Amino acid sequence: MTVSQQPLEPTPFGLHRVQAKTTSLEGILPLLTYHGGLIVEGLVSQDILQDIEKELRPHFQQGWNTDPMFSQKTRVVCGLPGKSPTLINECFGHPLFTEVCDALITSHSSSRFGEQRYDFRSPPVLGNTVAFSTLPGNAVQRMHRDDMDHHNMLPAIASDQYEAGRDCVVTLLVAGTRTTKENGATRFIPGSHLQETLHIPDESQAVYIEMQPGDAFILLGSTFHAGSGNVTDEEERILYSVAGVKSILRQTENIYYTLPLEKVREYSPWMQKRLGFSASSPLGGHIDLKDPREVLGLPEPSDIQWFY
């Protein structure tokens, strides 16, 4: 499906902002699919941010020590479904982000079982979670695309050729603190999602994603981006990252080994399914040809269409 409402006239790629209180899916999709990312101001309230920090602050203990993914001045926390239910429910589960993921990375297909035709729909699941605390002296990160874990090799296209399903990942970056060029704000290259996968990133085209606490940046998995150096004397930059992925692909983070079943039960049935504790239509992720929700004793079966 080609994404509609592209700009009527060719416009330069750049960084755009919308207001969470006044925008909608229809307002976001044209900008997101044209530029590759955009800022949603005020997506998360200050009260929710405080709750998230209370849940995650104790886990920020030591810097990254495995080169070259992050700087040693970056403290990284993963496995966030088991550490911050507030982040998962309020950010990953935010209605606006859910709508964006559903529109762009829901998997659709049709097949035959004998003469009978079946149409399958599989909504996205949580793919990855990371909380970042970057301290003064943090080094510049190299440009990368979030979809590389999923072998998503893409050809170059024109902006009006973009179709839902081209990307397999959509990421949400939530500012836990003020983020500036000086304290390490993420850089991204607008329009890079339209380039072929092995195109060499051009840093001269990068822009800084400067945000206030509670602002969020939505980006497509094929968009080049990277963390920047923190050249301040004492500012800490905190950023929370959650990503949706096509449910027919392997999740980047192994959520099933990091989230005990008793904590799974604390989430709503809808969120349990978005975390991946559910079969994917038609039969992905079954246990002895049964819905995992049945085997695990979770409420509400998956919304799948069995074909046998």
Curated annotation (Swiss-Prot):
Gene null: resulting phenotype: Does not affect the biosynthesis of penifulvin A.
Pfam families: PhyH (PF05721)
InterPro entries named among the record's database cross-references: Phytyl_CoA_dOase-like
Annotated protein name in UniProt: Dioxygenase peniF
Reported cofactor(s): Fe cation
Record-stated family: Belongs to the PhyH family.
Record's function text: Dioxygenase; part of the gene cluster that mediates the biosynthesis of penifulvin A, a potent insecticidal sesquiterpene that features a [5.5.5.6]dioxafenestrane ring. The first step of the pathway is performed by the sesquiterpene cyclase peniA that generates the angular triquinane scaffold silphinene via cyclization of the linear farnesyl pyrophosphate (FPP). The cytochrome P450 monooxygenase peniB and the flavin-dependent monooxygenase peniC then catalyze a series of oxidation reactions to transform silphinene into penifulvin A.
Enzyme Commission (EC) number: 1.14.11.-
Residues the record lists as binding Fe cation: H144, H225
Subunit composition and interactions: Homodimer.
Keywords (A to Z) from UniProt: Dioxygenase, Iron, Metal-binding, Oxidoreductase
Lineage top rank: taxon: Eukaryota
Underlying gene: peniF
GO terms (BP aspect): biosynthetic process
Originating species: Penicillium patulum (Penicillium griseofulvum)
Keyword Metal-binding: yes
GO molecular function, one term: metal ion binding
Presence of keyword DNA-binding: no
